[in-house]
Amino acid sequence: MVKRAVVLISGGLDSTTCLAMAKAKGFEPVCLAVAYGQRHAVELEQARKVAAAMGVTDFRVVSIDLRQVGGSALTADIEVPKDRPSDEMSHGIPVTYVPARNALFLSLALGLAEVVGSTDIYIGVNAVDYSGYPDCRPEFIRSFESMANLATKAGVEGAHFTVHAPLSGLTKADIIREGVKLGVDYGLTHSCYDPDAQGRACGRCDSCVLRKKGFEEAGVPDPTRYTESA
């Protein structure tokens, strides 16, 4: 019997690799993307392309307007930091943190999992290269999993939900190497927080810098379309 898993997908490098890993484990993925008012909405179109390229037949988008909440450079009129040194990137919580984003995303995935009869949820959080986001930490994932089994009908009736975060202990280079082994086309992915009108990556935000560094350290050509000034 085919086992289904809900996979949170953003169209980025990490979530795309996570999807490939879920498929490699034999799961039939139900992909869930979230339109939350993010300034880099181009990632949603890339998520569709990634899912189609991987043969996903169940792709869903849930809309939740976090611009009404604000508090982040991704959802409000706050400038996205550029050209930050690595030591600055590794300390503190950056303004690109979206308040409670992964808690919200996982809650949506949990509800969908219960509806489609799945007990497995995949999320591509990674805390090795970038430890600034509190909702990317393994302890958060474990805590959410515990909550999931207390807060759902399926959970209290004996089903056990598992939140898989297979990238949590990997560097960006490790993630890329794993994805290459699994046949991921990274040319379809988008990571930039502040792309131009053509969807090209700025090459200077934290996400772009980490992506560039990952490809360089992995020894894999970077297929990203950057702006001419990047």
UniProtKB/Swiss-Prot annotation:
ATP binds at residues 9-19. The keyword Zinc applies. GO terms for biological process: queuosine biosynthetic process. Gene3D superfamilies: HUPs (3.40.50.620). Pfam families: QueC. GO terms for molecular function: ATP binding; ligase activity, forming carbon-nitrogen bonds; zinc ion binding. InterPro entries: QueC, Rossmann-like_a/b/a_fold. It comes from the Bacteria. It catalyses: 7-carboxy-7-deazaguanine + NH4(+) + ATP = 7-cyano-7-deazaguanine + ADP + phosphate + H2O + H(+). The keyword Ligase applies. Its cofactor is Zn(2+). Binds 1 zinc ion per subunit. Its EC number is 6.3.4.20. Keywords: ATP-binding, Ligase, Metal-binding, Nucleotide-binding, Queuosine biosynthesis, Zinc. It is an enzyme of class 6 (ligase). Pathway: Purine metabolism; 7-cyano-7-deazaguanine biosynthesis. Zn(2+) binds at residues 192, 202, 205, 208. HAMAP family: QueC. Catalyzes the ATP-dependent conversion of 7-carboxy-7-deazaguanine (CDG) to 7-cyano-7-deazaguanine (preQ(0)). Belongs to the QueC family. This is 7-cyano-7-deazaguanine synthase. It comes from Myxococcus xanthus (strain DK1622). The gene is queC.
